[in-house]
């Protein structure tokens, strides 16, 4: 994210812009590091919880700043990405923090937000696809369609939680897992692919910069399969001493 400030702006505006940009970059870095640590740590451990807390705060900070600033750049698709990230992290957090897993008024509000994100992403994606260059404001149509698809799936999950009056067991863990992981995927992509100018010249445009995003998606799929299609959660409940030695 680059803030364009007029050379004639007052020192107060320049200072505020520098502070906002520094906070955005710092929170993004903390989010990527803490999210990676939470993903690799033993699930349910103190390290996992502490890293998750840092991830929650830093990602909400980063995405809130992005959502507030991106419309003025202007960068509509990045605005969608920022709001989606905030939404995914917030709903994932509530899923494991509340007994109802996010049903009730919060779930209704979350579903509405998810639908709005999906509609906005689809609309901007169509605008980009129908443009002469296939992009709008430097962002490709495919990115907008991807965000719209993820928001649609998340909104469907919210509606399912409302209908079921909560989410428990494997569904609850899976809901928390994929939302946090995809938020981390967005953050990693924004940094490693969207800010290539901060890397050495030989790395710019390199496929190596795709590895962090691939790793996040790979670990997300691994854990989703392990949670939903094996008895991992049941074994952890039955043998807590043994599970303490497992990831």
Mark where each language-model region is.
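Alpha-helical membrane insertion/targeting regions
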Residues: 1-247
């Amino acid at each position: 994210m680059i803030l364009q400030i007029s050379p004639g702006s007052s020192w107060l505006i320049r200072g505020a812009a520098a502070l906002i940009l520094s906070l955005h970059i710092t929170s993004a870095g903390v989010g990527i590091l803490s999210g990676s640590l939470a993903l690799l740590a033993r699930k349910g451990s103190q390290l996992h919880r502490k890293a998750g807390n840092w991830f929650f705060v830093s990602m909400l900070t980063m995405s809130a700043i992005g959502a507030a600033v991106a419309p003025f750049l202007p960068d509509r698709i990045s605005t969608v990405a920022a709001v989606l990230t905030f939404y995914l992290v917030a709903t994932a957090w509530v899923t494991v923090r509340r007994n109802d897993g996010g049903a009730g008024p919060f779930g209704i509000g979350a579903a509405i937000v998810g639908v709005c994100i999906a509609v906005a992403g689809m609309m901007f994606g169509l605008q980009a696809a129908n443009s002469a260059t296939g992009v709008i404001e430097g962002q490709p149509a495919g990115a907008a369609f991807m965000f719209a698809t993820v928001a649609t799936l998340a909104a469907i999950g919210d509606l399912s939680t409302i209908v079921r009056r909560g989410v428990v067991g494997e569904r609850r863990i899976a809901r928390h897992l994929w939302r946090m992981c995809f938020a981390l995927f967005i953050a990693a992509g924004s940094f490693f692919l969207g800010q290539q100018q901060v890397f050495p010249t030989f790395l710019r445009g390199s496929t190596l910069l795709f590895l962090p995003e691939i790793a996040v998606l790979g670990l997300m799929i691994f854990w989703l399969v392990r949670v939903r299609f094996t008895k991992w959660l049941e074994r952890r409940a039955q043998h807590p001493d043994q599970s303490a030695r497992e990831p």
